Amino acid sequence: MIRPKLIGITALTLTSCLFSVTAVFHSLGFRLNTTASAPVGLWRVQEAVTYQKGDFVEVCPPDLSIIRVMVDKGYLATGNCPTNVITLLKPIAVGKGDIVTIRKGLPVSINGRFLPNTRSMPTIQAWPDGTYLTKENEIWLFSTYSSGSFDSRYFGPVDISNIR
């Protein structure tokens, strides 16, 4: 017969080991993506001097009311960003000088070309309709992997200082 105390100690030991391994992997830059916003799998985050369109970045979303709403609804978890939100893994779709057009009911357009899977969902407040010229040190993050991705169609441009 296995004693309950032994089972408890074993469970605690295994849990501690799992948390330790997770912490080590995280400190080495490894991230497990389970969302549809990027290919599912194990990713490694590395610092870069420059960023370009197509690069995936780990980013803290801007401090906006839509971010807090998404946390309150359970769509975003709390985390280690300055706003107490988890970092997001997103592809850079737009850089300095690019023109972003957002129109309700239509996919986002970059320099006149529509991006697939970027029509905002009617149940979530989208970034205001308009045409935006991307500024220095500003990026827009749009995931074409999933129409349900939470990205710049909702929170707008992101300063590159938000990249982790």
PLM features per residue range, with description:
Residues 1-164:
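Extended hydrophobic leader/signal-anchor segments used for secretion and membrane insertion
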